[in-house]
Amino acid sequence: MTDALEQSVLALEGTVSVLKDSVESLKCANEPSTNLASTMLQTKRVFRLVPEYDVERSKLDLIEEVEPLVRTLGDKLRKSMGRMQRELDTLQQTYELNDLRLKKNISMDDDDALNSPDMGQEYEGRDADDVVMMASSTNEELEELKKLKEKKKQLENKLEILKQK
């Protein structure tokens, strides 16, 4: 048995000396060889089967890791959407208020300005004393306000027609 081990050691020492000589000759030659470089640096991919248990466990770990993040992002998104909706409502109310103020200022400056053709129809038929609730008006309340204003405008037009007759 010792003879076999000694022969193995001698064979390995011979292999090591051959490799050292090869490395030395490569250093001395120092000529770039793309073929040699491509064969020496080529990687080999090894695929092996992964047990189904490991795959399922990895999926569950990923779900446990990602699910709270998704929930957190969803909550932040809902809060942000609520904030944006409130801001939109406030901007709509501010628009209505500024629209009425502008109409009131225009009617004070020039009573004929509302009847001129170059003035938008947006201001026709409105009274200067229109009130806009700035408290906590909802979209439904604003829509109802617009409908009521339109109905008021129609009634005023009918009244004007009746007065002219």
Curated annotation (Swiss-Prot):
State the superkingdom. Eukaryota
List localization entries: Nucleus; Cytoplasm, Cytoskeleton, Spindle; Chromosome, Centromere, Kinetochore; Chromosome
The coiled-coil regions, if any, are: 74-104, 132-165
> Which of UniProt's keywords are assigned here?
Cell cycle, Cell division, Centromere, Chromosome, Chromosome partition, Coiled coil, Cytoplasm, Cytoskeleton, Kinetochore, Microtubule, Mitosis, Nucleus, Phosphoprotein
**What GO cellular component is one of the record's annotations?**
mitotic spindle
Q: Which residues carry this modification: Phosphoserine?
A: 107, 116
| Function, in words | Component of the DASH complex that connects microtubules with kinetochores and couples microtubule depolymerisation to chromosome movement; it is involved in retrieving kinetochores to the spindle poles before their re-orientation on the spindle in early mitosis and allows microtubule depolymerization to pull chromosomes apart and resist detachment during anaphase.
Q: What is this protein called?
A: DASH complex subunit SPC19
The record lists the organism as Saccharomyces cerevisiae (strain ATCC 204508 / S288c)
Supply the source organism's classification. Answer: Eukaryota, Fungi, Dikarya, Ascomycota, Saccharomycotina
